[in-house]
């Protein structure tokens, strides 16, 4: 049978399965592809295909992730599934596989377990916007009251971590039943119901081009007779020639005007998300701008020095530190295009952080950086990556 060409005429959304080990994340991923394959919305991908996920590198960290794609009538999805718990932690913190939403898989037979809690907390910390719950293995639970109890527990846990526990859709079913065609109600129908919930409940992410303009500064040149040109890749939004923009980070914020946009040596009237451009700035001196700052829409991003972060610290085997670190640890934090020194403050009751740990910590940078929640960074010592993190909240 000829492969159908994937039409890109549907809105795209990135999701993933999260939850405790052996609660059925990978089986569910396989079941979704099986059920949607009936209507031509996917190619069935078996459990063992997904489970031997290839390794990939993100921010110097090796992570195993499996990617499958499928579509419903409303949307096209890229779905990520990780084989091990450590891969989830790394994935969510580095943003290697950006998630616009996630399906939390909980085994009805076991109820919420330690990693269920940890994945919900991580989803909150790294800013996953919405969750939908699949209560798996319902064919192993005969007592409907027990099912209700597990559902209540899950809702309480979600609320505890600031997700709307009362409103989140919880779909009861069995991934195995769907894969083995044993129970249509808990299998096939539950999967369709789950996808309906995902379609309806996980908000469509705003496309990068529709967001306010931002471009990290990579290089600065002075062109005689024309002025200063700043180069970089536009991260989001659009910059039009003649628009006022701000230079944010490292020093005091300055206003300037973009008087020209150049790409591949051609002049354009605008640059947009994904473009590698040179931006000509009016009245800005070569020494007024440096790598590590950003150009952005005025007022859209502010410089900050203090923030709370969720970080993963590499193990020795991953090329990280061999020893733990303590409060007042001073590494470099690599934001976008540059390193900035910062001081780490560990939470009350945390004596030290071991290689391989993930940790919530407070960081004070020695110079301000254009910063927002969900911004990713690497932790480095003399150019060597020893960790990865994400801004969970800004203090000042």
UniProtKB/Swiss-Prot annotation:
Pfam families per the UniProt record, alphabetical: GTP_EFTU (PF00009), GTP_EFTU_D2 (PF03144), GTP_EFTU_D3 (PF03143)
Region annotated G3, chain positions: 81-84
Gene designation per UniProt: tuf1
A cellular component term, taken from the record's GO annotations: cytosol
Binding-site positions, Mg(2+): 26
Organism: Rhodopseudomonas palustris (strain BisB5)
Disulfide bond entries: none
Organism taxonomic ancestry: Bacteria, Pseudomonadati, Pseudomonadota, Alphaproteobacteria, Hyphomicrobiales
Localisation: Cytoplasm
Assigned protein family: Belongs to the TRAFAC class translation factor GTPase superfamily. Classic translation factor GTPase family. EF-Tu/EF-1A subfamily.
Region (G4): 136-139
Residues covered by region (G2): 60-64
Name of this protein: Elongation factor Tu 1
């Amino acid at each position: 049978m000829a492969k159908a060409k994937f039409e890109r005429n549907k809105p795209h959304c990135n999701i993933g399965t999260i939850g405790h080990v052996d609660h059925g994340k990978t089986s569910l991923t396989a079941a979704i592809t099986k059920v949607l394959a009936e209507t031509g919305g996917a190619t069935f991908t078996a459990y063992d295909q997904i489970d031997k996920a290839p390794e990939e590198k993100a921010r110097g960290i090796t992570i195993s992730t499996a990617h499958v794609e499928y579509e419903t009538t409303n949307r096209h999805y890229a779905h990520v599934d990780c084989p091990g718990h450590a891969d989830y932690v790394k994935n969510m913190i580095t943003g290697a596989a950006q998630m616009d939403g996630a399906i939390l898989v909980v085994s009805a037979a076991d109820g919420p377990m330690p990693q269920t809690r940890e994945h919900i907390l991580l989803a909150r910390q790294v800013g996953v916007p919405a969750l939908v719950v699949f209560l798996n293995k319902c064919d192993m639970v005969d007592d409907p009251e027990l099912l209700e109890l597990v559902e209540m527990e899950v809702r309480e846990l979600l609320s505890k971590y600031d997700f709307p526990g009362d409103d989140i859709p919880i779909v009861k079913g069995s991934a195995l039943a769907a894969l083995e065609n044993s129970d249509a109600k808990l299998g096939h129908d539950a999967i369709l119901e789950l996808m309906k919930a995902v379609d309806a409940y996980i908000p469509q992410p705003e496309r990068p081009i529709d967001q306010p303009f931002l471009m990290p500064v990579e290089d600065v040149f002075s062109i005689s007779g024309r002025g200063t040109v700043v180069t970089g890749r536009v991260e989001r939004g659009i910059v039009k020639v003649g628009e006022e923009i701000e230079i944010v980070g490292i020093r005091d914020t300055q206003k300037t005007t973009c008087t020209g946009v150049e790409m591949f040596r051609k002049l354009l009237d605008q640059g947009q998300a994904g473009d590698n451009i040179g931006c000509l700035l009016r009245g800005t001196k070569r020494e007024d701008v440096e790598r590590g700052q950003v150009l952005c829409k005025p007022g859209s991003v502010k410089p900050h020095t203090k923030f709370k972060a969720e970080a993963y610290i590499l193990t020795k085997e991953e090329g990280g530190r061999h020893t733990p670190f303590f409060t007042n640890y001073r590494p470099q934090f690599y934001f976008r295009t540059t390193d900035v020194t910062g001081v780490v403050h560990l939470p009350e009751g945390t004596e030290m952080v071991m290689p391989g740990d993930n940790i919530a910590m407070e960081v004070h940078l020695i110079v301000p950086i254009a910063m927002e929640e969900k911004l990713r960074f690497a932790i480095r010592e003399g150019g060597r990556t020893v960790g990865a993190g994400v801004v969970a909240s800004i203090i000042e």
